């Protein structure tokens, strides 16, 4: 049953100040009626689906023009949601957008859309499967080209196709088992070994998808990398080298960085937030102490910590103390900076030598950095399951493992089907074949309004 109400929201980002264009999106049974009531289109323009019309949004009194707009009507089912959809393209200033949206919402039967409600209706109306809807959100939030590529692979149906094939393979095996439960005397013996091999093959593919998804998280969400070290070892110089701009003040005065500086970069397709921390040392300066406290917090929150030492001065007791302060569960990379200068021998725990001055060792540093946080081969990933999808794939894989254990115990066929059904149900929940209110709430509550 189609929704009885029509929803409306701003579908484009509206930042404070002025913008070029904004889009007000409507979807539902009275969307076209609202457009005809709100927008006055002069001349002999032909009103029809998938046509651009020119006009003005008029105030309720029909006398005052609120904005000059373009109007696009897309009648069901040829629209994003599968319902009648209207897009009003207005000017992007905050007041212009606010006035147009408020005018639309004044019409009976129209309400503000909930987060992700347009995409949710697209799923309920069969325009998208659940993985494609999630890919829309991921494409909007992509922070790198590779993240956008992965999102497009999902939007093109790559995840849905892969999961559907695996689910159908399990359904084939379930059909064989259920036939034996009901009509075993009328059918030839079942090849239990072949069945188990098929279940194991599906399980292996699921675990591979889970592993790729975990690596793909680095592409989707990025990594937070804390640069720590004694004062004046070159943390800020390293940050500036990698970000290719003078983000941090670089001087010969120890303790110059007194706060936590951040720089957004992309390394081999992975979005990286570099956190240039204050040099950790004993000091009586209250401001510097605050920066050092934030540096300590960065050690805990980072996905990987880069300890920078002065290769020219050599390894010191302070370097060893800093290394010991990095939490054991946080990956770390030890970098000896100033490789362009002569220095004493360095201990074997130094991972790479680097020169922030001329860039020597930069490629090696990037490779080690990405490998330490599990993103070393992320650039080669074709499909990447998100957290929800990975959780369900893991549940399915665990159920298939239990099926194998049941087989080893030589239990009757109907015992095999219990875990097999759970695996099938989990895969169906990934794509939306198994859809519940709880699943819809979990997925779409994280979306932006207007998507």
From Swiss-Prot:
The keyword Zinc does not apply. SUPFAM superfamilies: P-loop containing nucleoside triphosphate hydrolases, TrmE connector domain. InterPro entries: G_TrmE (IPR031168), GTP-bd (IPR006073), GTP-bd_TrmE_N (IPR018948), GTPase_MnmE (IPR004520), MnmE_dom2 (IPR027368), MnmE_helical (IPR025867), P-loop_NTPase (IPR027417), Small_GTP-bd (IPR005225). The keyword Nucleotide-binding applies. (6S)-5-formyl-5,6,7,8-tetrahydrofolate binds at residues 25, 87, 127, 451. Residues 222-374 form the TrmE-type G domain. It is an enzyme of class 3 (hydrolase). It is found in: Cytoplasm. GO terms for molecular function: GTP binding; GTPase activity; metal ion binding. One of its GO terms (cellular component) is cytosol. K(+) binds at residues 232, 251, 253, 256. GO terms for biological process: tRNA methylation; tRNA wobble uridine modification. Its cofactor is K(+). Binds 1 potassium ion per subunit. Its main location: cytoplasm. Mg(2+) binds at residues 236, 257. Belongs to the TRAFAC class TrmE-Era-EngA-EngB-Septin-like GTPase superfamily. TrmE GTPase family. Exhibits a very high intrinsic GTPase hydrolysis rate. Involved in the addition of a carboxymethylaminomethyl (cmnm) group at the wobble position (U34) of certain tRNAs, forming tRNA-cmnm(5)s(2)U34. This is tRNA modification GTPase MnmE. It comes from Synechococcus sp. (strain CC9902). The gene is mnmE.
